[in-house]
């Protein structure tokens, strides 16, 4: 007996299951991704063995009481405090031991100096640097290290396996307290000293802890470490940094797969290889000490750092108040796991010929791919593995589809790409409508993508900085735009020309597009070592299998000849120009035993006899789009089924009539093959990119690239819905339309900055010591720089000068400032210099000294050929000049009011030997020392944060001409 009501299938390809299930999958994955990205795992209530979190927090508070740049007296105080803490921790560990613990050697490096250049480090012209070290080096002898103090011999060399270096710089910038840049790194390193001198945690290989000084001013401390004997011993490293102000510590970079695996064992790993590629491709312009350890020394290691929010980076909000013990524990736990793995490793992966010209004999690593899953697990594998899978997919996937297509043609079941077929007996033509919907997907994708990207240009035109404080409003707008218009266009197309092949054609188009993307990704993997395209490999793999399933579904259809014969018989009994809209009755459906298991036989199906209960509207075409949803619902109630829920539901009977034989539940398998992995990988990548870039506009970075990036990522994240989106009910798209309208209005009209997301403006005060004239300046973006400058009481409207300032289109506004009080005595005596000629006319000697400072400069209007600082070490690994000469020499001393003697060699082109002698002052811990900076901090709008422009807050100079 025929049931009067069709059985319910919760995963059928009908509007409600498609809408509910797909929405639940997206929400179930996106919400945890956002939560994991922003919430830091809590620190344990009780400190684990070997560490003391309460002690670490108190150390952080002490370290960040004042600004402590290299050129400040508070930096000396931090240096002395660190020495006391190191000795105290070592002594405490020694007293608590019942057995003999590891030897601990502390080196207060007050002898090392070095001359080097900025070539390859900064984007500016070549700059020469002379630096005197204030580093603190701690060596914990490993249980398997060779005994003796080889470093005391001038030519001493370590023996055995190489050691492990953990580095953290203890200087801050002059405008930030340095809680995360790099206070947390420093106290983490102190806790590592405590941990590895605690019984049960002694290192097998030697561990070197480097507290380096001078990173903020040019990576100077890391360069100086090259002259310390311990630099010969360390083969691997872990660099601890901060480029934000809290949150999770991220794996920024890693040199190779082998060293990354140790980090991957952390309890809460966090990061993606995308960051490494961004540095490699110069998308990220700033550098950390990692650059020196890897690029200059040839060491193998990792760069772990905080990365957001950048609005607090290098400002007075980089303090203990704006970080947390949870962030401390996140970095500390990762550092313990990574370091413990490295010092316990006894293999040969980090020893042997490195093939880098003899920098270090630390073996050869392999380029790696890595990314985390929800901050709790970590995938690490070689780039060669990714490349191999990419090539295999590029070859195998198309071949599989071709073979399947050939098989479908062979069994006469290829309905795709077929307009009609012929009845072999009569020669009559029967339409299959197999091309219907073939070009629908590119239309949907093209229009929805174009509209989403158009919003990027609109926001950039009207309110370009809105992302600075409201990145999720931008994301919501982009996602809503893409989703709503993709659904709307799909529904219009489905209303006009319903097609059961929409899914198959959509996946076929996605297959082709992702195949092209994978070709490009594979080329970059091989030729440039770019690994961040890993998501394309997974994306394509899912799409390829989903596409194959769509082709396999066609095997369940009747042969086109059998279908043609049946339609020929029906048309003889029901002549109508609109016969292609008629659907088979309930009795025309195959039974559950025959639907997909055997070929269609027209004799198996009987026509339904009309009765007084037969609907008069049966098989009638829809007449209005307004009735789109209701028509589907009413049809469902009027359709009977013989209990086979695996068949295509008949409420979509305006599609091709043969579609009733397609599997109704296949869509859910296709969706689960593509959507979850895409949401996870691209969702995490999208948030990572957003966190790294959404506030770079204040530094002159291109924000249009960010908006377009979010638009493209939004499309890629929602793309797995496109093959099914025509089945969505109107409820969620309508809700998203309201979200789109609300976020669009907000993004176009809202003020882009807030108390938590202040616009950074960079300060410097330049003083001509010969005349006493000085110019205070703020550098920032238009138009906000003008509002900030005019809010300062000392600024007079008629004396403001604003000019373009270098990279990123920022503006520099200058005005006569209040005279600073950075040194005692008349300002003309703040800098002393003497210029004398030597026997060689090409060489001139400069003697330079400054009051209450240990940083000066020589600037040349045209580059010089070479220079030499008396008493300096020169390392052949670190050239201090280049083919185009040197335009600036930076001089750093560990002693206050030092006198530098510099011999300068001019080039033949130096017909006029002109330039400046300049000294810098960076200590702003006392009020009224730099009164103009005090006024800027006090009276600038609440949405402004003041940071440094260059190494010195105050620059005092004399011009010279020889």
From Swiss-Prot:
UniProt-annotated binding residues for Zn(2+) 1: 169, 181, 241
Note accompanying the cofactor annotation: Binds 2 Zn(2+) ions per subunit.
Signal peptide span: none
InterPro entries: Fxna-like_M28_dom, M28_fam, Peptidase_M28, PFF1_C, PFF1_TM
Cellular component, GO annotation: vacuolar membrane
Compositional bias ranges of the Acidic residues kind: 602-611
Region: Disordered, residue numbers: 568-617
Regions of this protein lying in the Cytoplasmic compartment: 1-15, 412-440, 494-503, 556-667, 726-731
Gene Ontology terms, MF aspect: metal ion binding; metalloexopeptidase activity
Site residues (Transition state stabilizer), renumbered to this chain: 313
Transmembrane segments annotated in the record for this chain: 16-36, 391-411, 441-461, 473-493, 504-524, 535-555, 668-688, 705-725, 732-752
Binding site for Zn(2+) 2: 181, 216, 314
A biological-process GO annotation: proteolysis
Membrane-topology descriptor: Multi-pass membrane protein
Protein keywords: Glycoprotein, Hydrolase, Membrane, Metal-binding, Metalloprotease, Protease, Transmembrane, Transmembrane helix, Vacuole, Zinc
Residue ranges that the UniProt entry lists as topological domain Vacuolar: 37-390, 462-472, 525-534, 689-704, 753-962
EC numbers for this chain: 3.4.-.-
Localization terms from the record: Vacuole membrane
List of catalytic residues: 215
Family the entry assigns: Belongs to the peptidase M28 family.
Function as written in the Swiss-Prot or TrEMBL entry: May be involved in vacuolar sorting and osmoregulation.
Designated name of the protein: Vacuolar membrane protease
Organism field: Arthroderma benhamiae (strain ATCC MYA-4681 / CBS 112371) (Trichophyton mentagrophytes)
């Amino acid at each position: 007996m025929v049931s009067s009501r069709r059985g319910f299938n919760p995963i059928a390809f009908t509007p409600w299951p498609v809408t509910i299930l797909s929405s639940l999958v997206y929400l179930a994955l996106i919400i945890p991704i956002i939560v994991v990205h922003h919430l830091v795992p809590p620190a344990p209530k009780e400190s684990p063995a070997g560490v003391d979190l309460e002690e670490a927090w108190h150390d952080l508070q002490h370290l960040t009481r004042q600004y402590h740049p290299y050129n400040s007296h508070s930096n000396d105080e931090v240096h002395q405090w660190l020495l006391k803490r190191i000795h105290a921790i070592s002594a405490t560990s020694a007293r608590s031991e019942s057995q003999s613990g590891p030897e601990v050697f502390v080196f207060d490096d007050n002898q090392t100096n070095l001359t080097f250049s900025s070539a390859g480090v900064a984007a500016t012209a070549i700059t020469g640097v002379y630096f005197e070290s204030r580093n603190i080096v701690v060596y914990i002898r490993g249980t398997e290290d060779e005994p003796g103090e080889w470093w005391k011999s001038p030519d001493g060399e370590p023996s055995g396996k190489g050691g492990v270096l953990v580095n953290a710089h203890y200087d801050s910038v002059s405008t930030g307290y340095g809680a995360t840049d790099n206070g947390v790194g420093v106290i983490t390193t102190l806790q590592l000293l405590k941990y590895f001198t605690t019984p049960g945690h002694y290192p097998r290989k030697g561990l070197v802890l480097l507290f380096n000084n001078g990173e903020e001013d040019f990576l100077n401390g890391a360069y100086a470490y090259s002259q310390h004997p311990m630099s010969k011993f360390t083969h691997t490293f872990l660099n601890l940094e901060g480029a934000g102000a809290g949150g999770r510590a991220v794996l920024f970079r890693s040199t190779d797969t082998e060293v990354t695996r140790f980090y991957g064992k952390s309890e809460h790993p966090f990061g993606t290889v995308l960051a490494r590629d961004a540095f490699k491709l110069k998308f990220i312009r700033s550098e950390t000490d990692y650059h020196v350890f890897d690029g200059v020394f040839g060491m193998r290691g990792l760069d772990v750092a905080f990365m957001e929010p950048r609005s607090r980076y290098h400002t007075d909000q980089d303090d203990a108040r704006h970080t947390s013990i949870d962030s401390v524990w996140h970095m500390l736990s990762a550092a313990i796991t990574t370091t413990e793995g490295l010092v316990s490793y006894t293999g040969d992966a980090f020893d042997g010929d490195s093939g880098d010209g003899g920098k270090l004999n630390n073996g050869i690593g392999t380029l790696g791919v890595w990314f985390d899953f929800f901050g709790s697990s970590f995938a690490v594998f070689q780039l060669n593995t990714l490349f191999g899978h990419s090539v295999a997919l590029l070859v195998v996937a198309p071949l599989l589809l071709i073979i399947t297509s050939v098989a479908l043609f062979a069994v006469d079941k290829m309905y795709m790409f077929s307009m009609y077929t012929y009845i072999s007996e009569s020669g009559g033509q029967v339409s299959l409508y197999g091309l219907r919907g073939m070009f629908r997907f590119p239309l949907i994708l093209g229009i929805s993508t174009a509209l989403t990207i158009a919003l990027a240009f609109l926001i950039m035109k009207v309110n370009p900085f809105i992302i600075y404080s409201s990145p999720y409003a931008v994301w919501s707008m982009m996602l809503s735009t893409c989703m709503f218009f993709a659904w709307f266009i799909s529904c219009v197309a489905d209303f006009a020309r319903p097609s059961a092949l929409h899914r198959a054609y959509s996946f076929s188009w996605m297959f082709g597009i992702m195949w092209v993307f994978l070709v490009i990704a594979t080329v970059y993997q091989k030729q440039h070592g770019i690994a961040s395209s890993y998501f394309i490999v997974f994306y394509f793999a899912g799409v390829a299998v989903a596409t194959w399933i769509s082709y396999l579904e066609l095997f369940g259809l009747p042969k086109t000849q059998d279908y043609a014969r049946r339609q020929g018989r029906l048309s003889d009994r029901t002549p109508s120009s609109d016969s292609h809209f008629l659907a088979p009755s309930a009795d025309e459906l195959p039974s559950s035993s025959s639907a997909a298991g055997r070929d269609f036989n027209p004799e198996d199906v009987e026509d339904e006899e009309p009765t007084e209960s037969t609907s008069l509207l049966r098989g009638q075409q829809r007449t209005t789009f307004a009735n789109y949803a209701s028509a589907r619902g009413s049809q469902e109630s009027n359709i009977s089924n013989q209990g086979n829920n695996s068949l295509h539901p008949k409420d979509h009977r305006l599609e091709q009539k043969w579609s009733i034989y397609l599997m109704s539940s296949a869509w859910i398998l296709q969706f689960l093959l593509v959507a979850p992995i895409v949401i996870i990988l691209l969702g995490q990548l999208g948030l990572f990119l957003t966190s790294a870039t959404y506030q770079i506009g204040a530094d002159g970075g291109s924000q249009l690239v960010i908006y377009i990036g979010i638009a493209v990522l939004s499309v890629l994240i929602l793309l797995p819905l496109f093959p099914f989106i025509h089945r969505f009910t109107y409820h969620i798209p309508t809700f998203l339309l309201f979200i789109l309208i609300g976020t669009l209005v907000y993004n176009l009209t809202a003020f882009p900055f807030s108390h938590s997301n202040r616009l950074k403006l960079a300060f410097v005060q330049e003083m001509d010591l010969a005349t006493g004239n000085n110019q205070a300046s703020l550098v920032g973006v238009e138009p906000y720089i003008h509002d900030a400058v005019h809010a300062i009481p000392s600024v007079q409207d008629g004396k403001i000068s604003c000019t373009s300032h270098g990279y990123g289109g920022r503006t520099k506004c200058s005005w006569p400032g209040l005279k600073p009080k950075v040194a005692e005595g008349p300002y003309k005596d703040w800098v002393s210099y003497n210029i004398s000629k030597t026997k060689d006319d090409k060489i001139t000697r400069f003697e330079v000294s400054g009051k209450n400072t240990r940083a000066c400069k020589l600037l040349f209007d045209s580059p010089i050929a070479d220079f030499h600082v008396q008493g300096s070490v020169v390392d052949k690994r670190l050239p201090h000049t280049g083919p185009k000469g040197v335009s600036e020499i930076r001089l750093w001393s560990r002693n206050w009011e030092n006198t530098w003697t510099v011999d300068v060699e001019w080039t033949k082109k130096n017909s006029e030997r002109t330039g400046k002698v300049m000294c810098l002052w960076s200590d702003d811990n006392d009020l009224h020392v730099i009164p103009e900076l005090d006024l800027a901090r006090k009276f600038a709008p609440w949405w402004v944060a003041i940071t440094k422009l260059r190494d010195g807050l105050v620059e005092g100079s004399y011009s010279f001409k020889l």
